[in-house]
Amino acid sequence: MPLVPLAIPPGVYRNGTDYQSSGRWRDASLIRWTEGTMQPIGGWVTRATVSSNKKVRGSIAWSDNSADRWMAAGTYEKLFAISASNTVTDITPTSFTTGDESAALNLGYGGGFYGDYTYGTPRQDVVNYTEATTWSLDTWGEYLIACSNKDGKIYEWQLNVAADALVITNAPTSNLGIVVTEERFLFALGAGGNARKVQWSDREDNTTWTPAATNEAGDLELQTSGQIMLGIKARGQTLILTDLDAHAATYQGPPFVYGFERVGSACGAISRRCAAAVDRGVFWMGSRGFFAFAGGQVQDVPCEVSDYVFNNISASQRSKVHAVTNAKFNEIWWFYPSAASNECDSYVVFNYEENHWAIGTLARTSGVDAGVFANPVWFGTTGIAYNHESGFNLSSETVFAESGPFEIGAGDTTMMASMLIPDEKTRGQVSVTFKT
């Protein structure tokens, strides 16, 4: 009885028709490929309940100067500090303005004022989009820096669990986010309500924001038609992404302090948390593709599942898209709301070392990688923090991989398959189904 090898390359191919994925994996969930071997992802266990039934939309982990470990997590109405012993402390500033748990889209009828325009004449496209409230979190030394896109104020928390986070003195308000540069400047993004403005504090002093001959504070309005979405540290630079393009900020010293250069067009960010930095550069999701920046110019990242992802995403809830790294497996995960959901219930994963993709379903709203803590910590839709890559318990989720069609020979021979010899790392029972 002859054996016919089915050499299926790692990763999922989900572009085009089923037939175009011949000889490839067509669908999967909770499956990864590592060094050519297919296996389930690691399991997860509950770590802490951060906020009952409130979605975390921003998180960070860090160690303070005494080597104590912390996490911070923000919802649309609260900001929390989480100790290494999983004690959750509400550090919400007293002046914080509650935001929006979900995005809202108002278009067409009711989007304008009664009596505007003349009957039968064309109108401009009327779309009012309110984003879901998300948090931009970073550290200033051992202290937490936080800003929500709805509230717009910049806060600092100095590790005192008996005190709330406080507004940073003299910092601009009505901001869209923050990032702390490698040179220790605090950038306010969309500063003062100007969606294209970057304003920075003096070096090592986040309370000095007015430029003077004796400091390095400053500001600049980006030459772009878009609005700033996020800032993220890149190697030797700070990358600023708008919803249309990308700009790199490079420290130059006085008198200009920072120089800004557009490094990519038509590569805007889909959301304020869609970018992740790894050794190979910064990767992010756009509205119809994926991009990377490792110095020089932005590069497109070819994606073998882009048709599936972007035809399946909820455009109205795109502001909830977020990226999480899993460095142990050289992965970047993007969680997104599917077209049938208001919450992040699906994901797409890129293995940036082996250059392949995976897809699946899993509801997570934010997360931090391992490093500060032993395991990645990802947050579920009910406000629970989970230790991931821990054991083999995948709850009630279904783990599977489905291939595209196979042709034996030229497809002109009828064969009867009586046995399949798998080559994969198995955790428990595995069932196989043939489709004809």
Question: What is each stretch, according to the model?
Answer:
Residues 238-264:
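Surface-exposed extracellular loop regions of Gram-negative outer-membrane beta-barrel proteins
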Residues 87-90, 161-166, 207-214, 254-260, ...:
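Beta-strand initiation motifs
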Residues 130, 158-181:
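Asp-box/WD-like beta-propeller blade repeats and closely related beta-sheet repeat scaffolds
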Residues 1-96, 105-142, 265-281, 287-436:
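Beta-sheet repeat architectures centered on beta-propellers
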Residues 79-80, 152-154, 195, 246-247, ...:
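Structural signal for beta-propeller blades
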